[in-house]
């Protein structure tokens, strides 16, 4: 899980979601693409 100021989808499977007021990227194919804004 990367924590960075701006989160962007890295590949075509990355999904941008909001969880508890935080913007997150989840990726089913490549777990390295997981990000959280903070």
Swiss-Prot record:
An example Gene Ontology molecular-function term: structural constituent of ribosome
InterPro entries assigned to the protein according to its UniProt record, in alphabetical order: Ribosomal_bL36, Ribosomal_bL36_sp
GO cellular component terms listed in the entry, alphabetical order: cytoplasm; ribonucleoprotein complex; ribosome
Family of this protein: Belongs to the bacterial ribosomal protein bL36 family.
A biological-process GO annotation: translation
Protein name, UniProt field: Large ribosomal subunit protein bL36
The entry's keywords: Ribonucleoprotein, Ribosomal protein
Pfam name, any one: Ribosomal_L36
Tree of life domain: Bacteria
Disulphide bond pairs: none
